[in-house]
């Protein structure tokens, strides 16, 4: 059952999206395809990201009231009830941002496995058994990003760029 859910909602769509972009992008650049599939996923998750950001802003605004409740009410159960009531009044769900995180983790794992294992064969090979009917098998697949960086090799500059991008995000 969990394998069905994994393949239906995470791995197969990501793998097929990646292969689609490899076929669509001139030269079959896998690096650009990874960027394209990432942008598509970010766009799909944008409404959840906006909601999580709004929740965080409201949480910061009501933080003084939460501290006041904790000081005023010693009983933990009563504290929890009062806090949930405050969240309800503010119109937020404190667990909304957790949903986004739990959704992003399997998507990231699916993208990693799509590139590294690709349904049994790592890129540049394509497992045609996993392709949807409308996703063509690409003629050319280039593991060289923008014609100068082999993405299968270790690269300190790319690792540094990724670290800086993650830090600024």
Spans of model-derived segments:
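Helix-loop-helix
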Residues: 1-169
């Amino acid at each position: 059952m969990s394998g069905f859910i994994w393949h239906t909602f995470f791995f197969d769509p990501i793998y097929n999206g990646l292969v689609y972009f490899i076929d669509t992008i001139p030269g079959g650049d896998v690096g650009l395809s990874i960027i394209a599939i990432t942008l598509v996923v970010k766009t799909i998750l944008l409404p959840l990201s906006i909601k999580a950001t709004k929740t965080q802003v409201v949480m910061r605004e009501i933080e003084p009231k939460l501290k006041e409740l904790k000081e005023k009410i010693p009983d933990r159960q009563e504290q929890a009830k009062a806090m949930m009531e405050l969240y309800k009044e503010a119109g937020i769900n404190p667990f909304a941002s957790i949903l986004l995180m739990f959704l992003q983790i399997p998507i990231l794992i699916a993208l990693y496995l799509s590139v590294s294992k690709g349904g049994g064969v790592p890129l540049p090979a394509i497992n045609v058994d996993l392709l949807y009917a409308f996703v063509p098998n690409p003629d050319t697949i280039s593991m060289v990003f923008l014609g100068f960086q082999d993405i299968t090799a270790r690269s300190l500059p790319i690792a540094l760029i990724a670290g800086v991008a993650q830090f600024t995000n």
